UniProtKB/Swiss-Prot annotation:
<keyword id="KW-0862">Zinc</keyword>
<feature type="binding site">
    <location>
        <begin position="170"/>
        <end position="174"/>
    </location>
    <ligand>
        <name>substrate</name>
    </ligand>
</feature>
<feature type="binding site">
    <location>
        <position position="183"/>
    </location>
    <ligand>
        <name>Zn(2+)</name>
    </ligand>
</feature>
<comment type="subunit">
    <text>Homotetramer.</text>
</comment>
<keyword id="KW-0418">Kinase</keyword>
<dbReference type="GO" id="GO:0005829">
    <property type="term" value="C:cytosol"/>
</dbReference>
<feature type="binding site">
    <location>
        <position position="186"/>
    </location>
    <ligand>
        <name>Zn(2+)</name>
    </ligand>
</feature>
<dbReference type="InterPro" id="IPR020633">
    <property type="entry name" value="Thymidine_kinase_CS"/>
</dbReference>
<keyword id="KW-0067">ATP-binding</keyword>
<keyword id="KW-0963">Cytoplasm</keyword>
<keyword id="KW-0547">Nucleotide-binding</keyword>
<dbReference type="GO" id="GO:0071897">
    <property type="term" value="P:DNA biosynthetic process"/>
</dbReference>
<feature type="binding site">
    <location>
        <position position="148"/>
    </location>
    <ligand>
        <name>Zn(2+)</name>
    </ligand>
</feature>
<keyword id="KW-0237">DNA synthesis</keyword>
<keyword id="KW-0808">Transferase</keyword>
<comment type="similarity">
    <text>Belongs to the thymidine kinase family.</text>
</comment>
<feature type="active site" description="Proton acceptor">
    <location>
        <position position="89"/>
    </location>
</feature>
Length: 194
């Protein structure tokens, strides 16, 4: 499925927080390195939770990454010997990320992106739905609901231990102090009808 001698393609890894998206991205990048392929990893500058220059999973796995402010800055770091381009926290990139990913895949690169497919309200997040639509491979991961133990497909934002309101700002970078994985039935967003 992931032969490098094929022309370029797009892989999307998505799901809720704590579902293992960054861990899976790191695993795929490490596999390419074992195969002596050249990979480069990018992350948005806004994601500085664990490290400024690494993609770090919640369980501590990490890989070196290039922080970028704008999607098109990715092009400045691509060289001909690259085989694989990986992008973590893709939901935080600007709208140009879809075009950037398309161009890279069309140029023959394997492009792996990872990100949240839904925001804390349970709505499609950023450009991830568009990337899912154009990808050759989509992997949707689930966490475990912190309230009941069921498979969790949503991310619950908590403010002082209570669910955040529907009209709170969409982007709030954080980890377990601000977010929990939840299933459809335990996910709560005050002032929104289900």
């Amino acid at each position: 499925m992931y032969l490098i001698n094929q022309n370029g393609w797009i892989e999307v890894i998505c799901g809720s927080m704590f579902s293992g998206k960054s861990e899976e991205l790191i695993r795929r990048v490490r596999r390419t390195q074992f195969a002596k392929q050249h990979a480069i990893v990018f992350k948005p500058c806004i994601d500085n939770r664990y490290s400024e220059e690494d993609v770090v999973s919640h369980n501590g796995l990490k890989v070196k990454a290039v922080p970028v402010s704008a999607s098109k800055d990715i092009f400045k770091h691509i060289t001909e010997e690259m085989d694989v381009i990986a992008i973590d926290e893709v939901q935080f990139f600007d709208g140009d990320i879809v075009e950037v990913v398309q161009v890279l895949a069309n140029r023959g690169y394997r492009v792996i992106v990872a990100g949240l497919d839904q925001d804390f309200r349970g709505l499609p997040f950023g450009q991830v739905p568009q990337l899912m639509a154009i990808a050759e491979h989509v992997t949707k991961l689930q966490a475990v609901c912190s309230a009941c133990g069921s498979p969790a497909s949503r991310t619950q934002r908590l403010i002082d231990g209570e669910p955040a309101a529907f009209d709170d700002p969409i982007i709030l970078v954080g980890a377990s102090e601000s977010y929990e994985p939840r299933c459809r039935h335990c996910h709560a967003v005050p002032t929104k009808q289900r």
